[in-house]
């Protein structure tokens, strides 16, 4: 069933989470049991680095690296912050937004058939942007070779921004497919280009810690979005 009494979760939503959880756990365990990691001693033989290079003082070393972030990483951090702020907002608010704006539901309606239709359509258009992302990702290397990584990412983010803005002008559910094409182009680049740009600007022996720090610019904007967006809306 795709509807439920007020205060309850429809069965189709429950099963979506069950299936998604099983697939996620399967992917984690597959990676865990099939990926071979090399010990530091073996890696040091091939890189010419000593193990002392990789030693630090734990948390204090991480804060020191955070303070000494390369300039390119600081610049990309701001781009990541606003990209993921927008994405988290989209994931949370797309269903109620199109339910009200496209399907004509009341603001406080979250249990009618029309709201359920909006929720189901959100799942479809989210599938569209992920499909577009998978296809567009195949062309990213060629585009980046032609115009550069920075310009590639800028163009892709522009497409995503226009896609999100176009939702406001959507007069029918099918129009939202066009919106999600733009989002899909941005999504492909967000998952690849920042890391490609970052990899060339950080020391090889600091790759792990800086990639971890870089992920702060993914999690923190989502936390901020979750805290402030509800009162704003």
What label would you give each PLM region?
Residues 158-171:
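C-terminal ends and interior cores of transmembrane alpha-helices
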Residues 11-12, 104-131:
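Loop-to-transmembrane helix entry
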Residues 119, 202-214:
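Loop-to-transmembrane helix entry/capping segments in MFS-fold secondary transporters
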Residues 175-189:
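Hydrophobic core of transmembrane alpha-helices in multi-pass small-molecule transporters
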Residues 130-138, 223:
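Residue-level signature of mid-helix packing/kink "hotspots" within the transmembrane helices
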Residues 1-89:
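Intracellular loop-helix junctions on the cytosolic face of multi-pass helical membrane proteins
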Residues 135-149:
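Helix-to-loop junctions at the C-terminal end of transmembrane segments
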Residues 189-203:
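Intracellular juxtamembrane helix-capping segments at the cytosolic ends
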